[in-house]
Curated annotation (Swiss-Prot):
Reactions this protein catalyses: S-ubiquitinyl-[E2 ubiquitin-conjugating enzyme]-L-cysteine + [acceptor protein]-L-lysine = [E2 ubiquitin-conjugating enzyme]-L-cysteine + N(6)-ubiquitinyl-[acceptor protein]-L-lysine
Organism (species): Mus musculus
Official protein name in the record: E3 ubiquitin-protein ligase RNF183
UniProt keyword list: Apoptosis, Endoplasmic reticulum, Golgi apparatus, Lysosome, Membrane, Metal-binding, Transferase, Transmembrane, Transmembrane helix, Ubl conjugation, Ubl conjugation pathway, Zinc, Zinc-finger
GO cellular component terms given for this protein: cis-Golgi network membrane; endoplasmic reticulum membrane; lysosomal membrane
Disulfide pattern: none
Function as written in the Swiss-Prot or TrEMBL entry: Acts as an E3 ubiquitin ligase catalyzing the covalent attachment of ubiquitin moieties onto substrate proteins. Triggers apoptosis in response to prolonged ER stress by mediating the polyubiquitination and subsequent proteasomal degradation of BCL2L1. May collaborate with FATE1 to restrain BIK protein levels thus regulating apoptotic signaling.
Complex and partners: Interacts with FATE1. Interacts with SEC16A. Interacts with BCL2L1.
Molecular function, one GO term: ubiquitin protein ligase activity
Residue intervals on the Cytoplasmic side: 1-159
Organism taxonomic ancestry: Eukaryota, Metazoa, Chordata, Craniata, Vertebrata
Main localization, broad class: endoplasmic reticulum
Length: 190
């Protein structure tokens, strides 16, 4: 009985206790063979004074990163993903954000890929409020162009919705017509 509970514990990041997945909690392996989620390692790499060296949160063994190598390039714990029946996604670290680009499953859909980002917080030593010389970003919302409306029509979810609405409207009109026709037919005969 304690064995399945041990597997559950191993399927979680030992730092944040979130279950591993194939997005921002992808298990990454350090040189000491301990696995942590990429979000915790990214936080750790951003607050560590020596950015090229990560100390394992459990055993304190250092993992040396190559010059310019982000923590997202550490090896993924594929055994853990196999145990969870997940396929790995490529997560990248850009500045203080983790980015995940969701690739469409089929090349037949003309949907743009979605990009998910996770903000890891402000830089160490920066102020929490807005600086006085910068105003908040107030860009106007762009009006949808003809091209974006055309892309909306190509969206398979929109097409299914439009077909369903057309079928529902047709069936409703057919029912209304048949009810009035039968009333007129039976009352006209009598």
């Amino acid at each position: 009985m304690s064995e399945p509970q041990g597997q559950e514990l191993r399927a979680e990041c030992p730092v944040c206790w979130n279950p591993f997945n194939n997005t921002f909690h992808t298990p990454k392996v350090l040189d000491c063979c301990h696995s942590f989620c990429v979000e915790c390692l990214a936080h750790l790499s951003l607050v560590t004074p020596a950015r090229r060296r990560l100390l394992c949160p459990l055993c304190r063994q250092p993992t040396v990163l190559a010059s310019g190598q982000p923590v997202t390039d550490l090896p993924t714990d594929t055994a853990m993903l196999t145990l969870l029946r997940l396929e790995p996604h490529h997560v990248i670290l850009e500045g203080h954000q983790l980015c995940l680009k969701d690739q469409p499953k089929s090349r037949y859909f003309l949907r743009q890929p979605r990009v998910y980002t996770l903000d890891l917080g402000a830089e160490p030593g920066s102020q929490t409020g807005l600086p006085q010389d910068t105003a908040p970003d107030t860009r106007p919302v762009p009006i949808p162009s003809h091209y974006s409306l055309r892309e909306c029509v190509r969206n398979p979810h929109f097409r299914i919705f439009a077909y369903l609405m057309a079928v529902i409207l047709s069936v409703t009109l057919l029912l209304i017509f048949s009810i009035f026709w039968t009333k007129q037919f039976f009352w006209g005969m009598g």
